[in-house]
């Protein structure tokens, strides 16, 4: 009798979605430098549970502007890699800003090029928001605004990143009296030399709930009077709302015409510093008592505050920076070119300044305060 033939059924294991995508890419496109990841293929109806096609690494995501950028990216269904140096408890608020598994947190060292490469190797967008208002023993302005951005841009270029967005400042200039603004101007030049297609964002002073602009002046209530160089009549400011800056940055990740351009983000109105601070105290229902202080005296006081081992109230550089008038960007595209309508200061300032009011004024309406006087120069 012939031997019985037995057939053995072998069950094939299902392939994961990344494996299918990688296999399809290798078949139809051949071997490539960077394999196509399923996260860069947009699908869904929009929102946090869809896929926007953006895989973004956001340096400086734990800062003031960073949380808004991460929130906008997560809201439209992007994967976000968040390098951090702080304690894990300081990034907990970011975990809720994206769908399950869409946010990846990665410890990094700003001076370790390998950790930078690891943070950007899977991204098609890299956003640099790293900034600091004062120098420390570990990082001075040259490190923060020149060396680190150059290293990130270099790693992004080597990794084949499609879009690199670098945030600077509207008044960045090699001739500025502020060391931080001079360093930011050098940083722009270094980034552009390493990554010519980089998108550079130059916002004016940014205001929002956690800012160091409106809150800084409002906190002068503890000193009973506000020192201003020339009483603030020689300084013009054009502050911009933080959510507008965030939307502009996110829109720049998708705009094909934004590549290689420099954008100036400003608010719709310009104010003399005197009228702006007067409006801040009017919103908080506090008595506004300004007094003139020479710049060299104010800078010397800021230098003394800067010697504090803790977060300084002010510094010599900040005194100089807040008394520099915002330039009028006539030749640079702005928020409108990225589909964002700038928000007037008067509409959002109550969100920032309400906490500075005394208890009996907490429920008063915004209309009770006279708007700040604007200028056209």
UniProtKB/Swiss-Prot annotation:
The modification N6-succinyllysine is found at residue 175. One of its GO terms (biological process) is aerobic respiration. GO terms for cellular component: mitochondrial inner membrane; mitochondrial matrix; mitochondrion; respiratory chain complex I. Its cofactor is FAD. Residues 1-35 form a transit peptide. InterPro entries: ComplexI_NDUFA9_subunit (IPR051207), NAD(P)-bd_dom_sf (IPR036291), NmrA-like (IPR008030). CDD domains: NDUFA9_like_SDR_a. It comes from the Eukaryota. It is found in: Mitochondrion matrix. Belongs to the complex I NDUFA9 subunit family. Complex I is composed of 45 different subunits. This a component of the hydrophobic protein fraction. Interacts with BLOC1S1. Interacts with SLC2A4. Interacts with CLOCK. Interacts with RAB5IF. Accessory subunit of the mitochondrial membrane respiratory chain NADH dehydrogenase (Complex I), that is believed not to be involved in catalysis. Complex I functions in the transfer of electrons from NADH to the respiratory chain. The immediate electron acceptor for the enzyme is believed to be ubiquinone. This is NADH dehydrogenase [ubiquinone] 1 alpha subcomplex subunit 9, mitochondrial.
